[in-house]
Structure formats: structure tokens, C-alpha cells
Amino acid sequence: MTAVFPAADSVIEAACAKVNLTLHVTGRRANGYHDLDSLVVFSGAHDTLIACPAEGLSLAMTGPTAALLDAEDDNIILRAARRLAERAGHRPDARLTLIKRLPVAAGIGGGSADGAATLRALSRLWKIALPQAEMLTLAAELGADVPVCLVGKAVTMAGIGDHLTPAPPLPEAWLLLVNPRRAVPTPQVFKARQGGFSAANPLTESPASAQALAEALKRRTNDLAEPARRIEPVIDEVLRTLAALPGCLLARMSGSGATCFGLFADQTSADFGMASLRETHGSWWASADRLIGDTARVPAALAV
């Protein structure tokens, strides 16, 4: 990995991993998009987006998982930069660098988080102050998960990702994210899904502890886990391995996979679990970080 030394006038934004603690598929629209009900939080695991003043627009990528991406014109980072510049009437001038650490096509919104971080970074670099509702609308044009990543805090996500409402306050907890380094494209998972649809079951109570949060989550599910496990059976091994770790309160897949998470009450247990897992499954990607909740403030225009 090439070392990156940001210039003094650069802007740096973290693109944190999105974690679906629950995910219910509640319907399918005529255009093929699915309606969801999902409790979304974030993890401290992140990519880093650096924006520097420049003439013209460019993107360089480095980091452990950067080789899995390309910097072509359709990259979500470049699309986000151009959309923001167009919306704000600003020249798209910036030198962008992405330090890519999160796994790709992994169910934790890595690309969407990168796009959202680009919007935040360039708003600061270019001194643009669009209303939040307008920023969220712009984010939705880039992808279904970009608005929630732009908010970056705990929300209940409904519709196709365009209806966001604040989640109830969540307790302190830690997430151990694990990916077996297998990409699972989201369209394949939805295509493989069988059966009917689920009723929405949003979290309305505020759990007093990580244990209480785990119990509340056990009364809910991730409807995409079953089809994802059929596509990539190694997900079953990831879930079994997480569930067997001391202190793991819940093991579940995030999003459309293949990343899974273990929920822990404290950092010591999560760090011990990560160390144990790296000894037994050294080829897997793993990261233990604090659950980022901090109930989001969402404009009424984006609320259900």
C-alpha cells in the first residue's frame, strides 16, 4: 500500500461501513425494485476519502482492497463529484484519493459510503451548503444506500432506501465484522430469493443494554440471508464461527452479504473475538469497532 500524506488544505472524510442489524423485504415494485424495512447502524471500520484543490477532476485509489476497483468515469466517487458540482453550479475541480480498506460487494455499503463521503468532503472543500433534504435527494440519485450513508447514524430505512426515520437510542455495543473475501452481488441475492414478503417490524423501543438489543434483534431477521447462503455457503461457516466466540450476543449477516457481524457488549470481548478469529481463519477480513448509533436527525421530507 502506497503511503498517503494529505496536503494541508485537503479535506478528509471517513466512509464508515453500513450495517443492517435487521432487513425485511416487504414488497416488490413494478420497476423491479424492492421495498425494505431495515434498522441500519454504522461501524468504525471505514474507507478514507481525501479531497484536495486542483484543476480538473481526478481519482486515485490505494489501500488493501483498492485493486478490486477501478477509477473509470462511472465510479461512484466521480459521479458524486460531478453531480454535486452540477447541482451547486461549481466547477468539478478536485484531486480525490480513496484509501480503500472495506471489502467490495460485501453487504456493508462500501461503495455507497464512498459516494456519501465524497459529497461531504467536496461540500466542505468547495464551501457548498445545500439544504440537507436536497443533499439526500442528490444522494438517492447515486444509489439506494447513499442517503443512509450520508446521514451516517442509526435510522430505520424503508421504501427503496429513500424513507429514513430516526432509530430509537441504542446502547453502547461493539460489532465484529467478518467477510470471507467472497463478493456476493446484490442483484443475484434478490433474484435467488424465494417465497413471499415480510411485514415491516421496526424497532420502536430503546434497548437498555447490548444484551437487550440482541434480544430485540432476535425477534427480527435478515430476509436476504437464506438466498445469500445458497449462493455462498461459506456464509454459514462465518455465522457459526462468530456465534461460537465468547461474549457474542448475536451473529447475523449484514445486507445482501457476505459480511456478517457479531454483536458484543464491550470492546474487550470484541477484540478477543477478532484475535481468535484471525488465528483460525487468517484469510478472512475482520474488524472490531464500536457500533455507531447516535440517532439521526432526518428532514421531514425524507421521513416515512
Curated annotation (Swiss-Prot):
Q: Name one GO molecular function term.
A: ATP binding
Biological pathway: Isoprenoid biosynthesis; isopentenyl diphosphate biosynthesis via DXP pathway; isopentenyl diphosphate from 1-deoxy-D-xylulose 5-phosphate: step 3/6
Q: What keywords appear on the UniProt entry?
A: ATP-binding, Isoprene biosynthesis, Kinase, Nucleotide-binding, Transferase
For this protein, the record's Pfam families field holds: GHMP_kinases_C, GHMP_kinases_N
Give the annotated active site.
18, 145
Q: Which GO terms describe its biological process?
A: isopentenyl diphosphate biosynthetic process, methylerythritol 4-phosphate pathway; terpenoid biosynthetic process
Reported EC number(s) for this entry are 2.7.1.148
Q: Which reaction does it catalyse?
A: 4-CDP-2-C-methyl-D-erythritol + ATP = 4-CDP-2-C-methyl-D-erythritol 2-phosphate + ADP + H(+)
Residue positions annotated to bind ATP are 103-113
Reported function: Catalyzes the phosphorylation of the position 2 hydroxy group of 4-diphosphocytidyl-2C-methyl-D-erythritol.
Q: Which family does it belong to?
A: Belongs to the GHMP kinase family. IspE subfamily.
Q: Which HAMAP family match?
A: IspE (MF_00061)
In Swiss-Prot or TrEMBL terms, this protein is called 4-diphosphocytidyl-2-C-methyl-D-erythritol kinase
